[in-house]
Design a protein with these regions (language model features):
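Negatively charged, low-complexity tracts enriched in Asp/Glu with abundant Ser/Thr
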Residues: 1-20
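Short, Lys/Arg-enriched charge-dense amphipathic segments
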Residues: 3, 35, 42-43, 76-78
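Residues in flexible loops and secondary-structure boundaries
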Residues: 12-14, 31, 49, 67
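A short, structured beta-strand/loop element
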Residues: 20-56
């Protein structure tokens, strides 16, 4: 198991009352005390909570993927 500390995140979903896909960069903190920086995609429920899905997040389209990567690149962290 690992906990994820979010350092940066972007979404291209503007409706706050709908599910939103996020691209995040942060640090994975493992139970044994090790840490690693990395990227992940994750969904948020309409109420804002993260959906933990055993390491998998469905990316609906290539357009979503490219938009999220472009947004993160524009912010300078990808």
């Amino acid at each position: 198991m690992a906990n994820f500390e979010i350092k940066h995140e972007v979404t291209n979903y503007e409706d706050p009352n709908d599910w939103r896909l996020y691209f995040q960069w942060g640090t994975y903190h493992y139970e044994n005390g090790d840490s690693e920086d990395g990227f992940r995609f994750i969904w948020r429920y309409p109420e804002g909570n993260l959906q933990a899905a055993r390491g998998q997040a469905r990316i609906p389209s290539k357009q979503d993927l490219f938009e999220l990567l472009a947004l993160a690149s524009k912010e300078g962290w990808f």
